[in-house]
Amino acid sequence: SVGFKAGVKDYRLTYYTPEYQTKDTDILAAFRVTPQPGVPPEEAGAAVAAESSTGTWTTVWTDGLTSLDRYKGRCYDIEPVPGEENQFIAYVAYPLDLFEEGSVTNLFTSIVGNVFGFKALRALRLEDLRIPPAYSKTFQGPPHGIQVERDKLNKYGRPLLGCTIKPKLGLSAKNYGRAVYECLRGGLDFTKDDENVNSQPFMRWRDRFLFCAEAIYKAQTETGEIKGHYLNATAGTCEEMMKRAVFARELGVPIVMHDYLTGGFTANTSLAHYCRDNGLLLHIHRAMHAVIDRQRNHGMHFRVLAKALRMSGGDHIHAGTVVGKLEGEREVTLGFVDLLRDDFIEKDRSRGIYFTQDWVSMPGVLPVASGDIHVWHMPALTEIFGDDSVLQFGGGTLGHPWGNAPGAVANRVALEACVQARNEGRDLAREGNEVIREASKWSP
């Protein structure tokens, strides 16, 4: 006779283990689970643990050939979400050995690969992941990190300034380079390729790289500052992406750029390794993130994508703006900004941080505030993001009635004024606009 009965069995018998003590090497996940009516929360939580680790819908005889106790994911805690009917946070612990070392791709394939289409769940959202040092240490992480970047650029004690070149599609390479030069000459540290600028018929990548490099060197000579332009190396194949990164390095420019979600984590990690080996900084754009993180009840929170990027590698990443949005959102955004920059981040549910995260010595990533911001937001941005950030004004630079260079000057003057006022102990939240008004009187 066989040692088990055929048929569908309850997951919670095997995968719901409230007495489990989590190990330091476990990867922990917090899922927001919305079960279908009639499905008990323990069963839903256990189903998530099972389907994202060793489980399948029935018992198979090959289960006897492995040690489930050693390899199974475990749902070790379930708590109702306050104010929501029939919604729970399920905490799942995964043994370290379920994941390939140094592969964000494999981490996501396992944890979020299959389980989101599961019938017993109405919706499922991955809110946070605790990455143990035992796993994070298998990644290179950011090519350089915040401190090394400051040393390379020789810029200290203030946020960095950027600008996306607009109109994002349609300019010729020559005119594009001209806009880059004007912005950098006016006082910005960086200009940026838009995320959808790759290599289109109106502007091929090689021409753009060339004219942008010319703009960078000209602006550097005239200002005596180090300048950069995020040359977007994203391409249709990994080989083509690497070809573009190599060409950028041959031109001697300081930084390239990648769209890490559309390009994929495998491509991103390869590029990050190349960037460290060759002294290039890497700017990361999060195109496609809202497809994954916009829904409150389903998908993945951006803080998970941010942690994944820190492991995969990038020196800058776009992180929203916080300005003009709701207060609660500010706390949550600052939560994942800290996850990007700091070595050790305490668990704090009010900021959406479900687990204490210890990055040990992995370099940090500079958060980039970009999108719909302009010079009058400068006091708030300086205060919220602090010095370790990149503030990007696209239309807020190029939309200046006098032109690109005066737009760049305005941003730089405002930034320097805000930083100085803050260092003198003035309250930017209250006096910010006044600070900028005073500065503009003396600005050329």
UniProtKB/Swiss-Prot annotation:
**EC number(s) on file:** 4.1.1.39
CDD domains for this protein: RuBisCO_large_I
Please list the reactions this protein catalyses.
2 (2R)-3-phosphoglycerate + 2 H(+) = D-ribulose 1,5-bisphosphate + CO2 + H2O; D-ribulose 1,5-bisphosphate + O2 = 2-phosphoglycolate + (2R)-3-phosphoglycerate + 2 H(+)
Q: Where does the record place the modification N6,N6,N6-trimethyllysine?
A: K5
Please tell me where this protein is predominantly located.
Answer: plastid
Q: Where is the active site?
A: K166, H285
Q: Where does Mg(2+) bind?
A: K192, D194, E195
| KW Transcription (keyword) present | no
* InterPro entries (UniProt xref): RuBisCO, RuBisCo_large_chain_AS, RuBisCO_lsu_C, RuBisCO_lsu_C_sf, RuBisCO_lsu_fd_N, RuBisCO_lsu_N_sf, RuBisCO_lsuI
Binding of substrate occurs at N114, T164, K168, R286, H318, S370
What additional remark is attached to this entry?
Answer: The basic functional RuBisCO is composed of a large chain homodimer in a 'head-to-tail' conformation. In form I RuBisCO this homodimer is arranged in a barrel-like tetramer with the small subunits forming a tetrameric 'cap' on each end of the 'barrel'.
Q: What does this protein do?
A: RuBisCO catalyzes two reactions: the carboxylation of D-ribulose 1,5-bisphosphate, the primary event in carbon dioxide fixation, as well as the oxidative fragmentation of the pentose substrate in the photorespiration process. Both reactions occur simultaneously and in competition at the same active site.
User: What is its quaternary makeup?
Assistant: Heterohexadecamer of 8 large chains and 8 small chains; disulfide-linked. The disulfide link is formed within the large subunit homodimers.
What's the family?
A: Belongs to the RuBisCO large chain family. Type I subfamily.
Q: What is this protein called?
A: Ribulose bisphosphate carboxylase large chain
Q: What organism does this protein naturally occur in?
A: Ginkgo biloba (Ginkgo)
Lineage summary: Eukaryota, Viridiplantae, Streptophyta, Embryophyta, Tracheophyta
